[in-house]
Amino acid sequence: MPELPEVETTRRRLRPLVLGQTLRQVVHRDPARYRNTALAEGRRILEVDRRGKFLLFALEGGVELVAHLGMTGGFRLEPTPHTRAALVLEGRTLYFHDPRRFGRLFGVRRGDYREIPLLLRLGPEPLSEAFAFPGFFRGLKESARPLKALLLDQRLAAGVGNIYADEALFRARLSPFRPARSLTEEEARRLYRALREVLAEAVELGGSTLSDQSYRQPDGLPGGFQTRHAVYGREGLPCPACGRPVERRVVAGRGTHFCPTCQGEGP
């Protein structure tokens, strides 16, 4: 699933191409998945924002077109065999590429996210000033859940998913199975720094393109952070720090990659 770095990369690439353009039409054949998109048509794009894993096209007249990329969605500048919707602008068309069809588009009045409840409960953006250590530490101390499960929750840090939770926990040398409230202040600071560092590096490199090639930047180029993955997707390969094979187990229903030596064996 595209996470914060992939969605932020998409936002940065699309913004200069669409700002000031009029969204003439949203073309699709699935009104259940792409809801109320007619509300966005005929309006000029004023800004392209991001919250967590959501893209928000701010349109004139107090309207937003909200995009959630799902498991495999993304915007492309050229059509693909998996194009599910198209945003027709004045000078170009953006194609919504989504092989597994979990992506969504919503036309809404600005800030009215009743149809998108996840947007209403997102925590702070981990690369913003609002993501301060005291609140992060308090959130850890208030939860008995495993660290990996809490990081995926979106209320502690918006936009963190499987890839970057695993990578941040490895960099902080913390077990994904540890109860969050068991962390000392020093351990929590390590995780706080690691999370910000990993996400910032991934944004700088355009996100991660995995072996399924489902995520690519709008121009079709792959991301580059996958070359820096220490544990994610590396089951059985040597840990870059100690050489022990990386292991994969399930936490909160999600495959989790970690080094038993550097991070602890777990249950």
Curated annotation (Swiss-Prot):
DNA binds at H82, R100. One of its GO terms (molecular function) is 8-oxo-7,8-dihydroguanine DNA N-glycosylase activity. Binds 1 zinc ion per subunit. The keyword Signal does not apply. A zinc finger (FPG-type) spans 230-264. One of its GO terms (biological process) is base-excision repair. The active site is at P2 (schiff-base intermediate with dna), E3 (proton donor), K53 (proton donor), R254 (proton donor). Disulfide bonds: none annotated. Keywords: DNA damage, DNA repair, DNA-binding, Glycosidase, Hydrolase, Lyase, Metal-binding, Multifunctional enzyme, Zinc, Zinc-finger. Its cofactor is Zn(2+). SUPFAM superfamilies: Glucocorticoid receptor-like (DNA-binding domain), N-terminal domain of MutM-like DNA repair proteins, S13-like H2TH domain. It catalyses: Hydrolysis of DNA containing ring-opened 7-methylguanine residues, releasing 2,6-diamino-4-hydroxy-5-(N-methyl)formamidopyrimidine; 2'-deoxyribonucleotide-(2'-deoxyribose 5'-phosphate)-2'-deoxyribonucleotide-DNA = a 3'-end 2'-deoxyribonucleotide-(2,3-dehydro-2,3-deoxyribose 5'-phosphate)-DNA + a 5'-end 5'-phospho-2'-deoxyribonucleoside-DNA + H(+). The keyword DNA-binding applies. Transmembrane segments: none annotated. Its EC number is 3.2.2.23, 4.2.99.18. Belongs to the FPG family. PANTHER family: FORMAMIDOPYRIMIDINE-DNA GLYCOSYLASE (PTHR22993:SF9). Involved in base excision repair of DNA damaged by oxidation or by mutagenic agents. Acts as a DNA glycosylase that recognizes and removes damaged bases. Has a preference for oxidized purines, such as 7,8-dihydro-8-oxoguanine (8-oxoG). Has AP (apurinic/apyrimidinic) lyase activity and introduces nicks in the DNA strand. Cleaves the DNA backbone by beta-delta elimination to generate a single-strand break at the site of the removed base with both 3'- and 5'-phosphates. Monomer. This is Formamidopyrimidine-DNA glycosylase. It comes from Thermus thermophilus (strain ATCC 27634 / DSM 579 / HB8).
